[in-house]
């Protein structure tokens, strides 16, 4: 399998791992109070971002999987601020957990792991560990990539990815043969990207003989409507 397809599989696998979480048990021993406060801002404008989920959780890796135990989750205020307290069982530190405070995508905004601050961590009990935290989110724009299979060539890999600020934020489509295009029967890709900046779209096709044909385009999307981008292949 081509390298790009392998990357796509790995990214999808990690996403599924990170999406698995449970509620933390109610503290019954070794209980201590911790307060988290700060602000969620639009990274591009500096304005507060409302109705964004902020989560306090225990987390640790078990093999390749990250175990996440949610202690408390709140939404940022209209001004983007958050301020809450929770009881935690400090014995979890001795069990190999770290305490994490995270911001998530929500409402009109998305997070980017490659740009901006999206989490804070504590490895021991510290009442001020999560004071004055600023998290970054980006105004969301909707991009639809429309696929048109107009050629009759054979290939062993075809991948579409997108990114902003010079990085790759998502592998949106990956097939290993023309037959898989037909079998999948998916010709519109719904992509959430960042508003008012250029989104790079990379289209890579690898022929049977190993020759790579790479096309890179950019499109500027707006939060006020849907942007369409057509790919003929």
How does the language model describe each region?
Residues 1-20:
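Sec-dependent bacterial lipoprotein signal peptides
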